Amino acid sequence: PTLWELSSPMFSLPMTEYAQGLFETVLEEYEDLELNPSGRDEFMTKRQNFPFTDPERSVATYEELKATKKEFPELRNLPAVGGFDFASTRDFIAVGALFKVDGDYVFKSHSFVRKEFVDRIYSYSKPNENVNGKRRFAPIRQWEDEGLLTVLDEPSMDAQHVVDWFVRMRDEEGYEFQTICGDGYKMREYLQPKFEEAGFEVSWNGKFEEPLGYRVEVIRNFRAIDAQLSTVIEDSFANQKINFGDNDMMRWYTNNVLRHLKKDGNVEYIKKEDVRRKTDGFKAFEAAMFKADLLNEVDTTDFYDNLGWFMG
């Protein structure tokens, strides 16, 4: 802090009343970096006039991704926020349910992929693990066998698959959806009619009349939420507070995301490569994180302690 006057001359002594107030604000942000290291790039760009020299990196490190492989807790009857990515009907669609349990963001996801696309790009229908001497870029058939995705032999994937998944999670798995969030792109012509036919209310302003479990909230400017959510998402990865369960496809999705720091200091999430490196699952996760504040955190330790007292 004693050197900040080099980048901000107003911090030279004696400081004006305005400069003193700003200095205290910047000092608080600087001290917060110890707990929230993901904010370093933005701090250096916005507060020190020193653009970060490497503006692009993965959203999570290899070790942070490994740490997302945890056993799922019991999720039935817990509050959840749904998220989906429906940007393209001709390659991948992703859906998911977000929970908060014992401080962890727990995300259960599923994907729908179009057969023609995965045949052409990932050699899905070829029997061998290696194609032309090279290991498959994405093991689609393995993930299908593990129940992580559904391969659809359709010319264009029907939005009904998205709606049916959320209905099934609500009615059969007992997830208590506070809301379901997704991008407004293709909403009016594809998704909204399907959701409404199933009894959901689709809101473009965050206001609802339907009860919980029947609400879909449209994120009108999905690109803008990257900067809004980047700190909580990246700090959750860094502190090993994200649980993707036994789902290597979610780790693959996340590993394909490039964190790009724009010149204005804001973060945006982009693909590392447009065709093969899909990010749909991460975008569904991000959509759910948009309303993570609706989740009442569940402490299973207290639950089992109370259960033991009751049974004793």
PLM regions and their residue ranges:
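Acidic, metal-ligating active-site segments
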Residues: R90-Y105, G281, A287-A288
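Acidic, low-complexity intrinsically disordered tails
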Residues: F303-G312
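Non-catalytic, compositionally simple segments
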Residues: P1-V81, R90-F92, H110-V113, I121-E154, ...
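Metal-dependent DNA phosphodiester-chemistry modules and their immediately adjacent helices/loops
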Residues: P1, A198, S203-D299
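Short, surface-exposed connector motifs at secondary-structure boundaries
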Residues: R170-T179, L212-R215
